[in-house]
Swiss-Prot record:
Protein name, as recorded: Sucrose permease
UniProt gene name: cscB
Gene3D superfamilies per record: MFS general substrate transporter like domains (1.20.1250.20)
Main location: membrane
Molecular function per GO: lactose binding; lactose:proton symporter activity
Residues in compartment: Periplasmic: 38-48, 99-107, 168-170, 242-260, 309-311, 364-377
Domain of life of the native organism: Bacteria
């Protein structure tokens, strides 16, 4: 299948703008979040693990709400409006509320941060992804070609994040609010009341439809697979790898700056892969594509246990550019092929996002404790071993079903 980027489709442009602005906002602080907490605020590995656990646990509550409500709303925007306000308020919150509280009253800062980040980012990311995926199915373009702009946004944010962070993290936080304001303006332009296809996903969704998903054995196989792979990968990539990489250099500041550059380049590659991989997944099937993504995941984690050369680790980091698009696109296509496509937000947010978050909640603190006592190498060996075991589980138990690809009527290019 030929690569088709539908720039003339106005709905594609809206979906791309949503993704670009959200992810550039997120990357400006999230890509260096662990370094900020540990290097600037002085949190221990145990405190860092506890903070990540509480953040993820709180986001689970919002994910459950977001998934069910957005499936009922179709493509209506109340929840997207909520996200836009969180983006705008991020700068003042981080500077005047979160940072002082973590230093003076860790428990209160922990709780307020978990509520804020869960509502706007950790659950909001899945909400926005599922919202743009609904747009893609309703308005006839591949989700990955729009999501690629989110990766480009993340790359741009990550590139400048390291530069501004080395001057003052507060610059990063204020820029998030600036891009949040632009996100809000884009949301104003997308007039959901004018679209004829808005209710297509939501039509006839009943309580029984949601219950049927949770009774499906295949759903729970999928959840177990996600917990055993994506949860551990997020712990590795978010909590451990940034500090590990920065520590490979003589100066922590130099390592932080180079990590920002590397992260930016990696996400540019990720964006290119995000646009191409949907067509690869259509060819090989979502199960096979998902398993390939997990093989890359295991190799990347294991390589960090075996090598400490910054050049080798930098090359290993770039594997993320293939792995993440493979996993995310495959999850959406696996969900549509195996479950009720009207419930795509519920499946993605509960089956993928909540499942991985539960794993992070349960595993972040033990991983932090293991790191404090044994160091990076032992933790990386342990995580890669578990991911390999779950790869075998997926080979035997994940479904091989595929969605039937149907040619759709083109959508008009203007609103």
């Amino acid at each position: 299948m030929a690569l088709n980027i539908p720039f003339r489709n106005a709905y594609y442009r809206f979906a791309s703008s949503y993704s670009f602005l959200f992810f550039i906002s997120w990357s400006l602080w999230w890509s260096l979040y662990a370094i900020w907490l540990k290097g600037h605020l002085g949190l221990t590995g145990t405190e860092l693990g506890t903070l990540y656990s509480v953040n993820q646990f709180t986001s689970i509550l919002f994910m459950m709400f977001y998934g069910i409500v957005q499936d009922k709303l179709g493509l209506k925007k109340p929840l997207i409006w909520c996200m836009s306000f969180i983006l705008v308020l991020t700068g003042p919150f981080m500077i005047y509320v979160y940072e002082p509280l973590l230093q003076s009253n860790f428990s209160v800062g922990l709780i307020l941060g978990a509520l804020f980040f869960g509502l706007g980012y950790l659950a909001g990311c899945g909400l926005l992804d599922s919202f743009t995926e609904k747009m893609a199915r309703n308005f006839h373009f591949e989700y990955g070609t729009a999501r690629a702009w989110g990766s480009f946004g993340y790359a741009i944010g990550a590139f400048f994040a390291g530069i501004f962070f080395s001057i003052s993290p507060h610059i990063n936080f204020w820029l998030v609010s600036l891009f949040g304001a632009v996100f809000m303006m884009i949301n104003m332009r997308f007039k959901d009341k004018d679209h004829q296809c808005i209710a297509a996903d939501a039509g006839g969704v009943k309580k029984e439809d949601f219950i049927a998903v949770f009774k499906d054995r295949n759903f729970w196989v999928f959840v177990i697979f996600i917990v055993g792979t994506w949860s551990f990968y997020n712990i590795f990539d978010q909590q451990l790898f940034p500090v590990f990489y920065a520590g490979l250099f003589e100066s922590h500041d130099v390592g932080t700056r180079l990590y920002g550059y590397l992260n930016s380049f990696q996400v540019v590659l990720e964006a290119l892969c995000m646009a191409i991989i949907p067509f690869f997944v259509n060819r090989v099937g979502p199960k096979n594509a998902l398993l390939i993504g997990v093989v890359i995941m295991a190799l990347r984690i294991l390589s960090c246990a075996l090598f400490v050369n910054p050049w080798i680790i930098s090359l290993v980091k770039l594997l993320h550019a293939i792995e993440v698009p493979l996993c995310v696109i495959s999850v959406f296509k696996y969900s549509v092929a195996n479950f009720d496509k009207r419930l795509s937000s519920t499946i993605f947010l509960i089956g993928f996002q909540i499942a991985s978050s539960l794993g992070i909640v349960l595993l972040s603190t033990p991983t932090g404790i293991l790191f404090d006592h044994a160091g990076y190498q032992t933790v990386f060996f342990a995580i890669s071993g578990i991911v390999c075991l779950m790869l075998l589980f997926g080979i035997f138990f994940l479904s091989k079903k595929r969605e039937q690809i149907v040619m759709e009527t083109p959508v008009p290019s203007a609103i």
